[in-house]
Amino acid sequence: MKQDNGTPPSPAIGATNSKPVPGKPATVVYACSGCSDAGELADRIARQLSRAGAARMSCLAGIGGRVKSLVATAEKAERILVIDGCPLNCARHTLRLAGFEHFDHLELHKIGIRKGSCPVTEERVSVGVEAAKAILMRVDEKSSIINRTSEIDCHAAVESIQTF
């Protein structure tokens, strides 16, 4: 889409140019991005996954607001990864209320992140990214058996990752 002056529009704030990893199904990632340290961690993990090309981050608020183009992004995704920072699971609830039932779910509290007591550090972001990748790999390895499960036990998927 071009602007009236003939130049392409600048990307939206927070937009990424990530592309699916070749040979892997397109994954869209949604983070709760809540106001706590755990929400900030979820957001930073999703952004890092998007920059690395492991998934494409999309707007969770747009799902909640039923913005047609953003809902269409979720509908077209071959898979969805939801990252929640705390046990309230706002991101999971938002997707379910919008009619999405099948997605992978990383709950940061299950890997030792405690809302209000885990300041955002690069180490914690890296642990979260590895946990997300472990979940995505686990689903890839078992996709013919489990055929896209609704939820994965993220604690089991990251047994080898040290928690905080």
Ranges and model annotations:
Residues 1-59, 69, 74-79, 89-164:
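Iron-sulfur (Fe-S) cluster-binding modules
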